[in-house]
């Protein structure tokens, strides 16, 4: 299977994330998909702290154990929260822009890779 990574010209979410990091402002991302209803995501929500997350989301992070894989990590907010808890987390994304933001924000192990890349063969205890 050939793995797919995004190019900057086809990465509106990555562009919004890196723009928000650089300028501290962005409006909403409109998400269109044949797999679910149209949605709007306020970009600042992608930069929330653990304390700003809903209680269900906080609980999900607290229940993560062992070696954790954060798939589609975006800006790295979950990876950063897990790191603050002292947990071992690898954050992956197919967006080079998002991976750059994760590096700038201090995510310890951000990687530009597709989950379905046949060369990605590590094992994890928790997948988020």
Range-by-range predicted roles:
Residues 118-127:
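A short acidic, Gly/Pro-enriched loop at the edge of an enzyme's catalytic core
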Residues 106-117:
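Conserved SAM-binding strand-loop segment of SAM-dependent methyltransferases
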Residues 99-100:
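Short alpha-helix immediately C-terminal to the canonical SAM-binding loop
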Residues 1-32:
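N-terminal auxiliary segments of SAM/dcSAM-dependent transferases
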Residues 75:
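Conserved SAM/SAH-binding loop
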Residues 95-96:
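Conserved SAM/SAH-binding beta-strand->alpha-helix loop
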Residues 47-67:
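Conserved alpha-helix/loop element of class I SAM-dependent methyltransferases that forms part
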């Amino acid at each position: 299977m050939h793995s797919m990574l995004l190019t900057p010209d086809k990465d509106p979410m990555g562009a919004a994330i890196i723009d928000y990091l650089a300028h501290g402002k962005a409006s909403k991302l409109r998400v269109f998909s044949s797999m679910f209803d149209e949605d709007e995501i306020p970009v600042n929500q992608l930069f929330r702290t653990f304390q700003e997350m809903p209680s269900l989301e906080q609980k999900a992070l607290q229940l993560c154990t062992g070696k954790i894989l954060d798939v589609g990590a975006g800006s790295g907010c979950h990876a950063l929260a897990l790191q603050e808890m002292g947990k071992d987390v690898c954050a992956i994304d197919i967006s080079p822009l998002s991976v750059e933001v994760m590096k700038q924000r201090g995510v310890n192990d951000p990687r530009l890779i597709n989950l379905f890349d046949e060369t990605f063969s590590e094992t994890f205890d928790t997948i988020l």
